[in-house]
Amino acid sequence: LRANQFRRHKSHVIVFFIFIVSNCGGLLTPLGDPPLYLGFLKGVPFWWTFYRLIPIWALTLLILLFIFHLIDDRIFDDEETHVRGSLIQTIQEAQQPIHIEGWANVFCLGGILTTVMLSGYSLNPYLEAHCGAWASALSRLIQIAVMLVFAVVSYKRTPLVIHEENQFGFGPIIEVAVLFFGIFGAMIPALTLLEAKGQTIAITHPWAYFWLSGFLSSFLDNAPTYLSYASLAAGQHGISPSHLGDLASQYPKILAAISCGSVFMGANSYIGNGPNFMVRAIAEQARVKMPSFGGYMLWSGAILIPVFILMTFIFF
């Protein structure tokens, strides 16, 4: 936002940020998106997503970046003809070039990533062996507590001037928390119905899993949607939903389709993935006029859906 502060039209930059950074870019590892992390906790190998999904990830991002380049170039050239002086020169002569501050927070970020990885590699298996049915809840509780400690340390140790320069505030976080509390309540009946009637749904092809998981992920949270469809696929093939690693090894194309549908199509609407709405709230706090809910879906429908159709024909 600060790098583009001199520009008149910035909303397209934020829209593509949501497409690429908040959603599609997180496909490679369980650290990138909650659906993949839930799969990791259920036995999917950590590096399986990297080795299996990197061609899909690379082609999708290449196409999206190319489309963004075309759109941004067109808008930038149009701005150049309507501003006094050179916009490029204004940006190049900015008094404060792009730089990074707050390097101490790298330790806290590393601590959070380590916590996430250890939860899947050691903590979760240990608790399952000793705590039975309480293992999942205890694992999440411990993980959340440790991550909160790192978050508080990061917030307290960061100089106030950095927060002020980045216009940091808790408003967007609170707004997203309230919204998704309501979404989680609304999605429980839909997911319960899917689990109860899932065995009667005749889904056999990977492309069907891709689009069905993607459709629900567009309007419900993508993490439980992923788990529901992965469990459905496992049950249809005689695999325990608690051991999705077997699904990854025996039916990799199906799990790949569910993974891509859940991660990619979370970008189809503001409520498909938690970061989407948070990015929008942060942008609006910085006085960037963002598309409405329907307006954003026009962007995603015009850009993402054709890309996903292409991915279907190539990979699924």
Report the location of each language-model feature.
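Hydrophobic membrane-spanning alpha-helices of multi-pass integral membrane proteins
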Residues: 103-115, 178-184, 257-258, 299-307
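Intrinsically disordered, low-complexity non-transmembrane regions of multi-pass membrane transporters
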Residues: 71-107, 152-171, 289-290
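Transmembrane helical segments that form the transport core of multi-pass membrane transport proteins
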Residues: 109-236
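Small-residue-rich segments of transmembrane alpha-helices in multi-pass membrane proteins
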Residues: 18-26, 85-93, 172-185, 210, ...
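Membrane-interfacial helix-loop connectors
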Residues: 1-9, 13-21, 38-54, 188-268, ...
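Juxtamembrane and boundary regions of transmembrane helices in multi-pass small-molecule transporters
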Residues: 6-13, 28, 47-94, 260, ...
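Transmembrane helix-loop junctions at the membrane interface of multipass transporters and ion channels
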Residues: 33-49, 115-131, 315-316
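Alpha-helical transmembrane segments and their helix-start/interface "positive-inside/aromatic belt" motifs
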Residues: 10-16, 96-108, 167-177, 297-300
